[in-house]
């Protein structure tokens, strides 16, 4: 794992910063605190406890007198297209190719990025209502954010029986792909015809990473990133992300991808300073 972290002062000249005893540009060399691979389950579960309080579930919206910025890029891995050849319900399910690792300019798309340990800050800008579309025997979008307490609208264009399970990633049920007693299921949605629209709020009731998968068609999958605070992002193909108005302090930055697993890195945010974080799978 390679890491480059650069701190750049925002809105002030180098001379002014040096005059105030501050350093405008700081290069941090990877050392004992560099980005590292971590057990998939423990790191993914940190999204559910990424806010403040003893249990990590309490986030307070408040104006910040001072704040900093985090700008980063996720790279590495290999761009991959997966060819799907359905074996049944062929009237709706035709062979298709799906890009699980969209990539442009060396970036890794569909990576989820979040900060752990943020107790207060601006209001979460994640949408409170999102749509997941079943069309051509696949779910779109593959990965998307939704605010905790939001609603997920499941829409079908396929005339076939589908049983969608909502499973917390990191739990035993998600690793097996089935819901069983005592595992972390967030509900089931049944579809049987084109044109159906089924809302569910259970899937987004609390923060966490949720996998959607079909019991009857195992290649049908998608992910919901239920956000605990505003500092959660899903990267586009260029792998870039940005967090504005971050309260000054030290945090753990975690990245996850369904193919590459998880990495995490300690980052420090200072007032009026842009922290640059480049991480590679």
Kindly give the residue locations of the regions a language model identified:
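Extracytoplasmic copper-binding redox domains, predominantly the cupredoxin/blue-copper superfamily
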Residues: 10-281
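Bacterial N-terminal signal peptides
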Residues: 1-8
């Amino acid at each position: 794992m390679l890491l480059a972290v650069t701190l750049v002062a925002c809105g002030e000249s180098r001379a002014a910063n040096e005059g105030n005893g501050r350093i405008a540009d700081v290069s941090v060399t990877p050392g004992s605190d560099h980005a590292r691979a971590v057990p998939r389950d423990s790191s993914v579960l940190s999204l559910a406890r990424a806010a403040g309080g003893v249990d990590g579930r309490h986030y307070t919206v408040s104006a910040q007198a001072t704040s900093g910025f985090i700008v980063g890029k996720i790279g590495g891995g290999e761009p991959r297209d997966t060819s799907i050849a359905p074996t049944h319900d062929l009237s709706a399910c035709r062979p298709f190719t799906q890009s699980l690792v969209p990539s442009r300019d060396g970036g890794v798309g569909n990576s989820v990025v979040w900060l752990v340990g943020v107790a207060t800050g601006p209001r979460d800008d994640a949408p409170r209502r999102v749509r997941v579309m079943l069309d051509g025997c696949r779910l779109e979008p593959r990965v998307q954010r939704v605010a905790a307490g939001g609603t997920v609208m499941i829409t079908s264009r396929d005339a076939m029986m589908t049983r969608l399970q909502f499973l917390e990633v990191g739990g035993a049920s998600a690793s097996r792909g089935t819901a069983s007693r005592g595992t972390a299921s967030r509900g089931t949605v049944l579809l049987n015809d084109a044109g159906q629209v089924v809302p569910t709020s259970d899937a987004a009731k609390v923060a966490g990473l949720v996998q959607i998968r079909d019991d009857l068609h195992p290649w049908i999958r998608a992910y919901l990133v239920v956000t605990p605070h505003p500092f959660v992002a899903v990267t586009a193909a260029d792998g870039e992300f940005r967090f504005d108005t971050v309260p000054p302090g030290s945090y753990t930055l975690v990245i996850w991808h369904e193919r590459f697993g998880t990495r995490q890195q300690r980052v420090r945010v200072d007032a009026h300073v842009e922290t640059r974080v480049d991480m590679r799978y």
